[in-house]
UniProtKB/Swiss-Prot annotation:
GO terms for biological process: ADP-L-glycero-beta-D-manno-heptose biosynthetic process. It comes from Nitrobacter winogradskyi (strain ATCC 25391 / DSM 10237 / CIP 104748 / NCIMB 11846 / Nb-255). The gene is hldE. Keywords: ATP-binding, Carbohydrate metabolism, Kinase, Multifunctional enzyme, Nucleotide-binding, Nucleotidyltransferase, Transferase. It catalyses: D-glycero-beta-D-manno-heptose 7-phosphate + ATP = D-glycero-beta-D-manno-heptose 1,7-bisphosphate + ADP + H(+); D-glycero-beta-D-manno-heptose 1-phosphate + ATP + H(+) = ADP-D-glycero-beta-D-manno-heptose + diphosphate. SUPFAM superfamilies: Nucleotidylyl transferase (SSF52374), Ribokinase-like (SSF53613). Its EC number is 2.7.1.167, 2.7.7.70. In the N-terminal section; belongs to the carbohydrate kinase PfkB family. In the C-terminal section; belongs to the cytidylyltransferase family. This is Bifunctional protein HldE. Homodimer. GO terms for molecular function: ATP binding; heptose 7-phosphate kinase activity; heptose-1-phosphate adenylyltransferase activity; phosphotransferase activity, alcohol group as acceptor. It holds the Pfam family PfkB.
Length: 488
């Protein structure tokens, strides 16, 4: 069993130096509706499209999504795709992008046409320059990488064979890292593993492993033998073969072979899942995980990634929910830690077409009246967010001596209720700004308010939402409970 809380708490203190091939991933979703009258070719009725940072850039984004810092070195052309990638990466808080410009190179761009209903890929169009970086660009890459090695806890090379990781760049990075005692993970593309000589860990997939060995490995014994032959060539400490639905197998230089089965999930899209695996491995190993813990963490992350569409990242919260059994998930999982955390929940729920409800209050001493309103609110929606006044806000509204319980305690009590899906603490006297951010489908308050008195009702109804008043339970109020307790 992984001590995931202990491991993940160390993620934010790690820095990963990631070097590799950057690309722009575009997804065009739609359905084939007819055959073109111009030629015997299908016509795709486009419904939506999205753009993501791909290749080694997706590795960097997955590192950052786990809370670690990433120094990313890559290559981009002086074109529209390159400009879009630079802009996107510059806005990533935990990524420091060091992108070398190459005017002679087209930025790698992949456009995938995907069935919206079936999630199957129908066609892919690529724009790319496969030639290795020129000598001048090679030197610029090396000059950008070497000064960053002392800052890194671990180094990750993400090779997509698009020109960045030339033999000279690879050797400069691995040799430099070894002189400083830094571990190096390589996600290889070349069938010649000798060019990665001296790396700590190589992570080929099944096809890359077969290409490098020249033979199939149909069982664990033959895989381990072939892996050790490769390890002698690469002079690496371990080799990990990722095998899609068959899981992943690590062959260490010393010790037993470790096999981790794949999680049983409905696969939506495998694009970028390998990026998620190597990113999670790098962060986990940097944080002190042993081989098995790192593998199990990476396998859990891959299961989250393949259940998403497009080039996906996996957040620390998503990973935690997949690793820990539901019974062990603390109420804190239902407390929004930041505006960004709130937005992630909202995005996920809206993608699923869920009806979002909102109610708010101080909830200083939870009583049956509160429970009635919360239960009624949850019955009117698919996901209920409770806005909770902060300690400072309660004090301004209720006076000295309040709140009785601090905001953290109040949030944990609310989060423990089955009716509550998320608690969001706000500092203002009213939740108007929070309602504007959430844009709920349903706004709920106790029936001691009139419709006109409900804060935010104009915002909700203007968007076609609904405002619901729930009859209060007479004889219960926090103020009266406090007075009665004080006189006892």
């Amino acid at each position: 069993m992984i001590d995931f809380d202990g491991l993940s708490n160390a993620f934010s203190g790690q820095t990963v130096l990631c070097v590799g091939d950057l690309m722009l991933d575009e997804f065009v979703y739609g359905e084939i509706s007819r055959i073109s009258p111009e030629a015997p070719a299908p016509v795709i009725a486009v419904q939506r499209s999205e753009t993501n940072v791909g290749g080694a850039g997706n590795v960097a984004r997955n590192i950052a999504a786990l809370g670690a810092r990433c120094i990313f070195v890559g290559l981009a052309g002086e074109d529209d795709a390159g400009a879009r990638l630079r802009d996107t990466l510059s806005r990533e808080r935990l990524i420091e992008p060091l992108l070398i410009s190459d005017p002679a190179r087209s930025t790698t761009r992949k456009v995938r046409f995907v069935s919206e209903h079936f999630s199957t890929h129908m066609l892919r169009a690529d724009w790319e320059t496969l030639a290795p970086a020129s000598g001048e660009v090679e030197q610029a890459l090396i000059d950008a990488i070497l000064p960053q090695l002392p800052c890194a806890d671990i180094v990750l090379l993400s090779d997509y064979a698009k020109g960045v990781l030339t033999t000279r760049v690879i050797r400069s990075v691995i040799d430099g890292a070894r002189r400083l005692g830094k571990r190096v993970i390589v996600d290889p593309k070349s069938a010649d593993f000798g060019i990665y000589r001296g790396a700590t860990l190589l992570t080929p997939n099944s096809k890359e492993f077969t290409d490098a060995t020249g033979r199939r490995a149909d069982d664990q014994a033959s895989l381990a033998k072939a892996a050790r032959d490769l390890m002698r060539i690469a002079e690496c400490e371990a080799l990990l073969v990722t095998q899609s639905e068959r899981g992943m197998t690590l062959v260490p230089g010393e010790g037993e072979v470790i096999h981790v089965p794949a999680h049983t999930v409905k696969v939506r899209d495998v694009t970028g899942a390998g990026d998620t695996v190597v990113a999670t491995l790098a962060v986990s190993l940097a944080a002190g995980a042993d081989w098995e813990a790192a593998l199990r963490t990476a396998s859990a992350a891959a299961a989250v990634a393949v259940a998403k569409s497009g080039t996906a990242i996996v957040t620390l919260a998503e990973l935690r929910r997949n690793i820990l059994p539901p019974a062990s998930l603390a109420a804190e999982e239902k407390i929004a830690r930041s505006a960004g955390d709130l937005d992630q929940h909202l995005t996920a729920w809206r993608e699923q077409g869920l009806r979002i409800g909102f109610t708010n209050g101080c909830f200083d001493i939870l009583h049956p009246g509160h429970v009635k309103v919360l239960t009624g609110a949850r019955a009117a929606c698919d996901r209920l967010i409770v806005g909770l006044n902060s300690d400072a806000s309660v004090k301004r509204l209720k006076g000295e001596g309040r709140p009785i319980q601090n905001e953290r305690a109040r949030a944990e009590v609310l989060a423990a209720l089955e009716a509550v899906d998320l608690v969001a603490i706000f500092e203002e006297d009213t939740p108007l700004n929070l309602i504007g951010r959430i844009q709920p489908n349903v706004l709920v308050k106790g029936g001691d308010y009139s419709l006109e008195q409900v804060v935010g009702q104009e915002l909700v109804t203007a968007r076609g939402g609904e405002v619901i008043l729930i009859d209060i339970l007479q004889g219960f109020s926090t103020t009266s409970l406090v007075k009665r307790a004080g006189g006892a």
